[in-house]
Amino acid sequence: MRKLLKSFKTEISPTIEQKIKINKTIGTCRYVYNFYLDHNKTLYDNGEKFMTGKSFSVWLNNEYIPNNPDKIWIKEAYSKAVKKSIEDGCTAFTRFFKHQSAFPNFKKKGKSDVKMYFVKNNPKDCRCESCLLYTSPSPRDPKTSR
């Protein structure tokens, strides 16, 4: 039996600073995803072993960014969002190696659906609060019609 999930679409109206942070994070996620694909493709062409998402994340933070100071802007994005984009790239390669999908595509600005992980209740950026929706009881509801 399939489980049905209920979702609600809400419109957000971020401030200018929040829009800048969101755009930077989405751009960084796109760059890191493409960089992960390119790095593994280069390793494959050189006959080296495939780099998993975890080892790529360690290499990116401990070796690549310190040796390339022009790429320090990667650290400005949410770390969880960057890790999630690396995980997505790793999943794409894993599915490719299992012959479940084609070779992963590079993401292009404006043409690809880039996903981003939002940090919940980060006090520096925004605060998400839950709200309860109250509905009036239905006249046909047996629990409330007594």
Predicted regions and their residues:
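Nucleic-acid substrate recognition interfaces
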Residues: M1-S136, R140
